[in-house]
Design a protein with these regions (language model features):
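N-terminal helicase ATP-binding lobe
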Residues: 1-181, 185-286, 290-317, 322-337, ...
Length: 533
């Protein structure tokens, strides 16, 4: 056990010590069954475990077990997303043996349902409204559970009240046993220590993601070309920074859908189907942050997730939507910005931070120049109204500061591969030998045309098998880069070439006929053979 004091945050109250314990136990459920009943009122505990570990499910399950033993116990469960709550409502009802009571609700009604037995289920948006309206019904609950608590910082750049809500939590739930859950608590931990009335106990389980394969790309066009070439039997989930970006990108693909916050209102049946089946209905799904937390996807065809950020916290949360079974793997795509792009991002962040810091110096100038300007919605959504003043959300400033610090770290790094190493470290992965990270290679139209022309030339020709195999492999890698299991000292056999041709979907196939490889152009129905050497 170690006492870990975090950096002071200017202008905030004295922070509580953070007492951190590393847990090596592999059984979260067994540990929670001994921990939760012994928590004291007005205590603060953060449980940290990797995405997909069952941290949320087992915490809630353990607390509800206590409710079943003692009918006087009450619980408030709060999360960052409606999706989390929708999935948890079914689990809560199942454990309380009242799941049939949910049958009378349609999709919208289920979203609006806030009480199941002794458990109140809210998003943090709904909780904030209750606190602001002076609703005191929840102040005497025995357990307060906040899932994905880091979202108060991560969402702060588009939800203006997260800082105010964080300040209110320990006061509003002052008699409760407060349990915070997160796989990525780093953004929120110091801020939570500022507002909590008691020392914070951080119980951290090891988290690593050996089934994830990070793939880096330097240009969006490279990514789009690659996604178009994935096997037809596989699906991709692509996170986008905005609805407009999602619309633009999804228009470039067949069998594509866009999921946004509006989906659950405009198409609640589709939304509920996504949550209940845990599968994607389109080959390519583009999504805003609506499903970047809480949505669990078990779709075996989902093999590719594209992250919209280089922040390790967001990479983990977005890639973590796919729940993997033993033996399954996931390709996780991460942008690799250039120095010029990093400088541009940093410049924008510093400009926004400079504007927000003018609020304390000159309110009237800040309001007239930024808040009332029609094209400055970016500034307005960072601010809230209190006591006759328009104030910036201090967690938004913290979030922007954190982004700026991360970018400065990349810009000023003396050693190469700094972003790649940072991501590998965050995912608990061993660094590849000789820094052999995986990158998407830009394939030019010329290289693709050369490959296609070469294939056309082989139809009707007879050549030595090993020569054909080696040339085919080289041509493919010139266009698309090496595949995961490719080795320089191994040629491709017939089965590999057949699979690659099927994936490319260029109208070629290859078969073995009487010891001869026969390459066919399916569009012209002509054949050629390569004899075995």
């Amino acid at each position: 056990m170690k006492l870990n004091f975090k950096v002071e945050l200017l202008g905030r109250p004295t922070f509580q010590p953070i007492i951190e314990v590393q847990r090596s136990s592999s059984s979260i459920s067994k540990f929670l069954s001994s921990l939760v009943p012994n928590l004291a009122p007005d205590s603060a505990t953060i449980l940290v475990a990797g995405v997909g570990s069952g941290n949320t499910t087992w915490t809630l399950h353990t607390v509800i077990d206590l409710c079943l033993q003692d009918s006087s116990i009450s619980v408030c469960f709060v999360s960052s997303r409606c999706a989390i709550n929708s999935q948890m409502k079914h689990k809560i009802a199942r454990q309380l043996k009242c799941e049939h009571d949910l049958d009378c609700y349609n999709e919208i009604g289920l979203q609006q349902l806030k009480q199941i037995g002794p458990v109140t289920i809210l998003t943090y948006h709904a909780l904030y409204s209750m606190i602001r309206e002076g609703d005191s019904r929840l102040q005497d609950v025995d357990f307060f559970i906040f899932d994905e608590v880091h979202s108060l910082v991560q969402d702060a750049t588009f939800v203006s009240f997260t800082g105010e809500l964080l300040r209110d939590l320990p006061r509003f739930f002052s008699s409760a046993k407060r349990i915070y859950l997160s796989a990525t608590p780093e953004p929120i931990l110091a801020h939570l220590a500022k507002v909590e009335s008691q020392p914070i106990h951080v119980l951290r389980f090891p988290s690593h993601y050996p089934q994830w394969k990070p793939i880096f790309y330097a240009d969006e066009s490279i990514l789009l070309q690659h996604l178009h070439s994935i096997p037809k039997t596989e699906k991709a989930l692509i996170f986008v920074p905005s609805i407009s970006a999602g619309r633009s990108l999804s228009s470039k693909f067949d069998s594509a859908q866009l999921i946004t916050a509006r989906t659950k209102l405009e198409n609640p049946q589709k939304w509920q189907e996504l949550l209940s089946t845990q599968e994607l209905s389109a080959r390519y799904t583009f999504s805003t942050s609506t499903i970047d937390a809480g949505v669990s996807l078990t779709d075996p065809a989902l093999r590719h997730i594209v992250c919209s950020s280089i922040d390790p916290v967001e990479v983990i949360q977005q890639a973590g939507r796919r729940r993997l079974k033993s033996g399954e793997t996931l390709s996780v795509y991460i942008p690799l910005p250039s120095q010029q792009q990093l400088w541009l991002q940093l410049s924008r962040l510093e400009e926004t931070l400079s504007i927000l810091r003018t609020t304390s110096n000159n309110q009237s100038l800040f309001i007239s120049k930024y808040v009332l300007e029609e094209d400055r919605t970016d500034i307005r959504q960072l601010c809230y109204w209190k006591d006759g003043k328009i104030l910036p959300n201090y967690l938004a400033i913290a979030s922007l500061d954190r982004q700026a610090q991360n970018i400065r770290h990349l810009i000023n790094a003396k050693s190469p591969y700094i972003l790649e190493r940072t991501i590998y470290h965050a995912l608990g992965l061993s660094l590849p030998a000789d820094n052999r990270f995986i990158y998407l290679k830009h394939r030019s139209d010329g290289e693709i045309s050369a490959f296609q022309d070469w294939l056309h030339a082989q139809v009707g020709e007879i050549s030595e098998k090993d020569s054909f195999s080696e040339t085919f492999k080289t041509q493919y890698q010139n266009c698309f880069g090496a595949r995961k299991n490719d080795r320089s000292d191994r040629s491709w056999g017939l089965s590999v070439i057949k699979k690659v041709l099927s994936t490319l979907n260029w109208g070629f196939s290859i078969e073995a006929k009487r010891g001869i490889w026969v390459l066919s152009d399916l569009r012209t129905h002509s054949e050629g053979g390569e004899k075995i050497g």
